[in-house]
């Protein structure tokens, strides 16, 4: 395959741009801590190609636990605003091919207001896990550790799933408008990390205790426990798949839905409080995956 690359220098430490033209298909990569979009053709063709391009396989070999975090929601009528199992399958297949032989892969979610294991079954994840011999984890009932942070905005402490703290977490949301947040993205997807066992109300099956304040604060504080390490957004209905570091991926996702990222309250809050600090300190997750 012939590749043509055009490099446009800007700031040698942080920013550069690469335009890669592959068979007339343009993929843009912007910056060392940015993201990638690729034209969608099919899950089976686009996902492996994208993940090979950004060299994700090299990164996941470093980790003993890989956690795929889809977004699952209750089924209303015949539809569910959930991550497609077919989309997750292609990410899973890539991880299985590229992981360290002793590494484990899990699919984890904590559905709000429904039994997670039943949702796994209804949406095809149980069969997927059986087919590839990987574990399903209900984050609503998994082992947690008490996390206290001085820079939580609203929560005094959060009971956070240990599997997410210990694993390399790949957030896998569908791109869609949300009811309580502007849209479902790789960062707001992590609301599923609040275990219902600790956050549901006495007379409710939903995680009502995270709704004492506007949801942007719950998103912010759960991300203070841990950012997802990587994000792949199913924006196939918009004609592309997005992948990269969560902050940038969600900014690009916002544009696809017609928003400026600083119009999205949770993104604006996150940007202003801690992600800039992480970038300056070089601590944002896998800053060199896209650059390699």
Regions found by a protein language model. Give the residues of each.
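Extended, low-polarity segments enriched in aliphatic/aromatic residues
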Residues: 22-79, 86-292
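N-terminal amphipathic/basic-hydrophobic helices that include classical n-h-c signal peptides
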Residues: 1-24
């Amino acid at each position: 395959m012939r590749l043509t690359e055009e490099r446009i220098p800007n700031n040698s430490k942080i920013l550069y741009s690469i335009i890669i033209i592959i068979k007339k298909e343009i993929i843009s990569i912007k910056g060392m801590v940015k993201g990638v979009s690729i034209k969608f053709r099919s899950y089976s063709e686009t996902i492996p190609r994208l993940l090979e391009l950004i060299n994700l396989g090299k990164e996941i070999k470093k980790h003993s636990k890989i956690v795929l975090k889809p977004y699952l929601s209750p089924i209303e009528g015949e539809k569910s605003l959930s991550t497609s199992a077919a989309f997750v399958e292609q990410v899973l297949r890539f991880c299985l091919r590229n992981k360290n032989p002793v590494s484990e892969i899990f699919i984890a979610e904590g559905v709000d207001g429904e039994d997670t294991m039943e949702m796994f079954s209804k949406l095809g994840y149980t069969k997927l896990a059986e087919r590839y011999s990987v574990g399903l984890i209900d984050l609503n009932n998994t082992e947690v550790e008490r996390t206290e942070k001085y820079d939580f905005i609203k929560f005094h402490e959060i009971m956070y799933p240990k599997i997410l703290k210990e694993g390399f977490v790949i957030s896998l949301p569908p791109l869609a408008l949300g009811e309580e947040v502007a849209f479902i993205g790789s960062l707001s997807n992590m609301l599923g990390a609040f275990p219902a066992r600790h956050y549901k109300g006495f007379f409710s099956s939903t995680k009502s205790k995270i709704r004492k304040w506007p949801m942007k604060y719950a998103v912010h504080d759960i991300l203070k426990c841990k950012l997802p390490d990587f994000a792949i957004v199913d924006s196939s209905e918009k004609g592309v798949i997005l992948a990269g570091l969560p902050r940038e991926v969600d900014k690009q996702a916002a544009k696809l839905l017609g928003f400026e990222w600083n119009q999205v309250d949770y993104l604006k809050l996150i940007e202003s409080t801690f992600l800039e600090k992480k970038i300056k300190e070089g601590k944002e997750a896998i800053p060199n995956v896209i650059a390699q």
